[in-house]
Every structure is written in C-alpha cells, then in structure tokens.
Amino acid sequence: MALPHVNVDQLREERYILGEKTLIGLLENCPKNQTIGDNLVRAWSKINNSKYEKIVCSLSGGSDSDVMLDICTKCDKDNKIDYVWFDTGLEYQATKDHLKYLEEKYGIEIKSYRAIKPIPLTCKEYGQPFLSKQVSEFMNRLQKHSFKWEDEAIDVLIPRYCKWNEKKQKWIGCVSALEWWCGSKGSSSKFNITQNKWLKEFIIANPPTFKVSNVCCQYAKKDVSHKLLSEFGYDLNIIGIRKAEGGARSTAYKSCFDENGKSKGNTYDNYRPLFWYKNSDKDEYDKHYGVLHSRCYTEYGLKRTGCCCCPYGRDFEYELKITKEYEPKLFIAVNNIFGDSYEYTRKYKEFCKEMDEKKRNN
C-alpha cells in the first residue's frame, strides 16, 4: 500500500516507473511511516535526476550509514552511485568485516581511501583532540600564540597576544580565541568557554602540558572527501547526517539538501537522505527491511562507531573498556595516540565534581 500524501496515479503519469527498480514498487513495500515514505520519494527523485551523472556516497560502517546505503541501493535504478569509505587508521575490525558483508549483500564495491595524514602522525605533529572540536580549535589557536592561560580581561589580553594592523585598523591574531577564553560575546553565545562548565577554571589551575588540536578529522576525512570530489568530478555528494543526532555536524545544516558545494575545480550538490529521521524512524526502517548492523553494535554493545575511542566521545571510557576486551591491539594503539587527552579529560571531570561539591557546601 502507498502511504498517505503519495499520489500513485500521479507518479505513474510522471513516469517514475523506469527500469527494474520502480518507485511504485518501493512504496508498495514501504512501512506506514510518513517520514520514511516521503524520504524514499525524495531519495528516488534526487538520485535518478538526470542532472546528476556522477554520484558518490560516503559510508562509515555505522548504523546510520547502513540505512542510508539500503535507501541508495533501493533507489539507484541506473547504478550511478559510487560507494566510498574513509579509512582513518583507527577503525574497528568489526567495521571492516561489516563493510565486506555489505559489499556481498548489495553486490557493490566500497572503495577505501586512506587518510591524507594518518591520525597518529597528525596528533604527534599538531596535537591531540580534547573535549570537542570547538574547544580543541580555540585551545590550539591560543597555544600557537604561546598563551599563558591567564585570567585577565579581553582588553588586557588582546594587546599582549595580538598585533595591530594599521591598514585594516583592527587587531589580528588569536582575537576570536581570546574572545572565547574571556567570554566576551556573552554567556548565551556558543563561542564562550563557559559552555563547558568549570573549563576555564580547570585550565588555569591545570595548564595543558601537551599540544591540543582538532585537525585529525580534517586530514583523515574532510580533506580526503574534498580531494575525491575534486578529482572525480562528482556532481552529487550523499552523506549520512541526521538532525536528531545533534552535534556540530547536524546543526550546521538546515535541511536535507543544499546546492553549489565547492571543492577544488568542481561544484556539487549535497544530499542527506537521513536528515529528518528520528531514532524511532531508523529503528522502524531497520525492522521492516531487515537491516543488520555491525558487531560493534550487536556484540560489542557500542552506541557509535567511527574513529575508535575518540576523545570527543562522551562515552570514551566505555569504548576503551570494550576495545580492550574485543580488540586489544587497537586498545594499545589509541592509548599511545590519545593518552594525554584521556588523562586530561579524566582530570577535568574530577575537577568538575570537586567544584560542584564546593558550590553545594558553600
């Protein structure tokens, strides 16, 4: 049965039924879920649009990626989509095994691309990720200017760490990072260190003894993706971002589609098939279509995959415990790479508990 709001006769008249895969057949086997039904119509329309001759879909081996792949294979009647996976160098063996399973299940090839700079080298050269991408970026900028982690006003710090540009009539250097440190944009601004409770107080009391940076993601994924889009001239880029997952990636977009993305020598559109999916929609899709996820979920009990035991993850301690049990070699590797960040994060969390306790007692 077709879903409400989907006019089957109109679809027939508009000649959506083409080739072996048909939109009508897709909708007749669709669960009675408006989000899933509308999404399939939209996915069919985007993927089979004659405007797009070369399409790339970036897979991760995670649960969102699994649903996205299932949608794409159901809708891609002319097999226009190339499937790729970015090997960060810190991937679970269970993820690699799952990708092989997906190739066999769907009869596709998932091309693997290595990081431009391996994460171990990136962390050694630029610094380790700490707490979040934004926090890491601002701390990195301040470290580059030999910041002393001082509790001073913005008017005092800017002349001390920035340079005055006479031509532009403004300060240049780590201005935005100092504004973050001082909270000069106001308490409601997301560019304020107070968005992370007690962080400023912690850093002043415990200045980092290691370099902090957020560029590991850039060299392992972002730059690899841009290089791919540029070299192969793809005109549609499909990625598995969901609004409901939260985080910087999801809040950076307002809808499931945007035009005129740019990479060196190439322009392309971006499509996010799962953007409007809530957890319940994804669960219903899994159950209805029999989508199976990797052992990271079904055996290890992880809630996320991707870069193993990433310090940005709230549950990195749990991930470390699981990785030690199931993939001990990877456990040793991540501790060698992110060890300083893990210890600093533990120290920060303990500091927060102590400060909260002091506040309650006063």
Please place each PLM-identified region on the residue numbering:
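ATP/NTP-dependent adenylation/nucleotidyl-transfer catalytic domains that generate, transfer
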Residues: 2-24, 52, 266-267, 279-362
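ATP-dependent adenylation/nucleotidyltransferase module used to activate substrates
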Residues: 2-281, 286-288
